[in-house]
């Protein structure tokens, strides 16, 4: 009798209510269950878990992969800044696309190239032999090597010349690492463009291919030429400094700023514009130095945290984690600010050079 009453009762219920009934038991609302008030209300500021660092899911996946690879904290902070820049540029591109812009697909192609560089730079491209290029700041040691016999020879000559103090050798080593990174990015870009052209040749008809090579591919090769020019200028500078030592009248010390200043001097800028750019570069270099300081502090905090965890001091671990998290957040913020400023300065110089052409 009882089962018959139950069946009769169930037939009288609406379909949706039946579905909810059979999905039970329901978690209590106070625990944030699936159907609690908290879960159904919009969340204006969701908690940033490891998988919620970015608005774009593919970038979250890359971030999670990097964490699984246990990259050093400074490298992770650098990657975070690179992914933030990538996300900003991709979201801006989506707005352009909605407005019917980027018809030739060049901006989209540049975004893909930039992402490929990031993947290769941090060893996230799935290649077992991926060379993780160190950033300009701290993580590269002299034991890492420079991957180029010419650079190795120059560096050995500089070290044994007696022309450099310990501080100057550290500065010169950062310049060598910066050059190594530029070469690596050039090679990644070259490989990406080679794959792109192969795809076009295999898929697109010859008539369509001629139009593409006349616009998109041409601009991509222009980018390659600019990077190669920068590499050659950098190598000339390394040769000069390695043989002569540092000049007491040097304008700048940070490798990225030196590159920008060299490009600015050969760009189509008036004396007034060049002087204004020089002043802006001074502020930019100060910003980089501040970022480098926080990177050093983050490395120290990371070592202290590892030591505290190894001895099992709970209170000390708690304090160390708090300081580590604070420095990590600040390093990420400054890294993004530096990269954003660098992108802006590089773009302005590039446009000035194109206007000259």
UniProtKB/Swiss-Prot annotation:
It is found in: Rough endoplasmic reticulum lumen; Endoplasmic reticulum-Golgi intermediate compartment lumen; Golgi apparatus, cis-Golgi network; Golgi apparatus lumen. A motif (Prevents secretion from ER) lies at residues 354-357. One of its GO terms (biological process) is amyloid-beta clearance by transcytosis. Residues 237-353 are annotated as: LDL receptor binding. Residues 219-310 form a coiled coil. It comes from the Eukaryota. Its main location: endoplasmic reticulum. One of its GO terms (cellular component) is endosome lumen. Changing residue 291 to A: Strongly reduced interaction with LRP1. Belongs to the alpha-2-MRAP family. It is linked to Myopia 23, autosomal recessive: A refractive error of the eye, in which parallel rays from a distant object come to focus in front of the retina, vision being better for near objects than for far. This is Alpha-2-macroglobulin receptor-associated protein. It comes from Homo sapiens (Human). The gene is LRPAP1.
């Amino acid at each position: 009798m009882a089962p018959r009453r139950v069946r009769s009762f169930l037939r009288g219920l609406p379909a949706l209510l039946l579905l909810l009934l059979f999905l039970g038991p329901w978690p209590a609302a106070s625990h944030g269950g699936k159907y609690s008030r908290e879960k159904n209300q919009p969340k204006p500021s969701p908690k940033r878990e490891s998988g919620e660092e970015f608005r774009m899911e593919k970038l979250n996946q890359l971030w999670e992969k990097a964490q699984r690879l246990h990259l050093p904290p400074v490298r992770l902070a650098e990657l975070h800044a690179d992914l933030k820049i990538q996300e900003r540029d991709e979201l801006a591109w989506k707005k352009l696309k909605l407005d019917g812009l980027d018809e030739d697909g060049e901006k989209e192609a540049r975004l893909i190239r930039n992402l490929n560089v990031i993947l290769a730079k941090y060893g996230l491209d799935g290649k077992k032999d991926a060379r993780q290029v160190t950033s300009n700041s701290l993580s590269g040691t002299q034991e890492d090597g420079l991957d180029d016999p010419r650079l190795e020879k120059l560096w050995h000559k500089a070290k044994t010349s007696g022309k450099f103090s310990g501080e100057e050798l550290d500065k010169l080593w950062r310049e060598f690492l910066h050059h190594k990174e530029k070469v690596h990015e050039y090679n990644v870009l070259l490989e990406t463009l080679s794959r792109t052209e192969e795809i076009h040749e295999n898929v697109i008809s010859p008539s369509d291919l001629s139009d593409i090579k006349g616009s998109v591919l041409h601009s991509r090769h222009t980018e390659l030429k600019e990077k190669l020019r920068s590499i050659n200028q950098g190598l000339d500078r390394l040769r000069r400094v390695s043989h002569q030592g540092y000049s007491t009248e040097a304008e700048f010390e940070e490798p990225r700023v030196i590159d920008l200043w060299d490009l600015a001097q050969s760009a189509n800028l008036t004396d007034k514009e060049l002087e204004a750019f020089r002043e802006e570069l001074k502020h930019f270099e100060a910003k980089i130095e501040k970022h480098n300081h926080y990177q050093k502090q983050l490395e120290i905090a990371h070592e202290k945290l590892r030591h505290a965890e190894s001895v099992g001091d709970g209170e000390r671990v708690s304090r160390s984690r708090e300081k580590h998290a604070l420095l990590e957040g600040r390093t990420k913020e400054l890294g993004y600010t530096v990269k954003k400023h660098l992108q802006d300065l590089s773009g302005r110089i590039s446009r000035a050079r194109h206007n000259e052409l």
